[in-house]
Amino acid sequence: VHAQHAESAPVIYLPVVMGDGTEVYERCQELDCPPFTLVAIGGLDWNRELSPWECDGTIRDAEPFGGQAAGFLDELLGQIIPKAESSLPQPPAWRGVAGYSLAGLFALWALWQTDVFERVASASGSLWFPGFIDYARERTMTATPDAVYLSLGKKETKTPNRMMRHVLDDTRAMEELFIERDIPTTLELNPGNHFTQTDLRMARGIHWILTH
């Protein structure tokens, strides 16, 4: 938990693939983010716990996606959030969820499952995930967020991987879906591929949802 002591500051929940979120939090401070608390969640089985349903791996012999996001979301809502917020001096002004790559997919998927999160930042989200855009189009959102941030690296479509190469089209489709539902949304295109300045990209998303 990385906290700035301010009256009723927002709390943002961030699943991380490694580390404890310190690098992202430091980038947020460099961007002059308003006071907020960042709760980083590590120790995840990334492909299993952040994927909404089962799916083959992105390349032959790669680890498949386990489709256990619902279980992780239950743990987040039932255990992680209550424990994190019990240490705060006051209840949060609002809650957000953020994520990079597959965690960015999870953050958006959560809007169709719960109304706990009022703002979402998905940086280089894995929106190529098979079936997700259709899932989002065909179902009613449980939450109507106050702001949604999307981003992608400009070179992320330059991949031989057939599953991933349409990620820009999928991200634009998600942007359009939110705009059609009158949800304030932005899509930021960053230089580089999927692995360029990941902490800064995530921090830019958090900054945007904190200031919009």
Identify what each model region corresponds to.
Residues 1-4:
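A short loop-to-beta-strand scaffold at the N-terminal edge of the catalytic core in hydrolase folds
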Residues 109-119:
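Conserved hydrolase catalytic core segment
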Residues 9-75, 79-87:
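Serine-hydrolase catalytic machinery in alpha/beta-hydrolase-like enzymes
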Residues 94-99, 123:
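Short beta-strand immediately N-terminal to the catalytic nucleophile in serine-hydrolase-like folds
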Residues 98-103, 107:
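Gly/Ala-rich beta-loop-alpha elbow adjacent to hydrolase catalytic centers
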Residues 14-17, 124, 152:
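The conserved beta1-alpha1 loop
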Residues 28-29, 111, 175:
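A conserved amphipathic alpha-helix that caps or lines the catalytic cleft of carbohydrate-
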Residues 127-197, 203-209:
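The feature captures the conserved acid-bearing segment of alpha/beta-hydrolase catalytic domains
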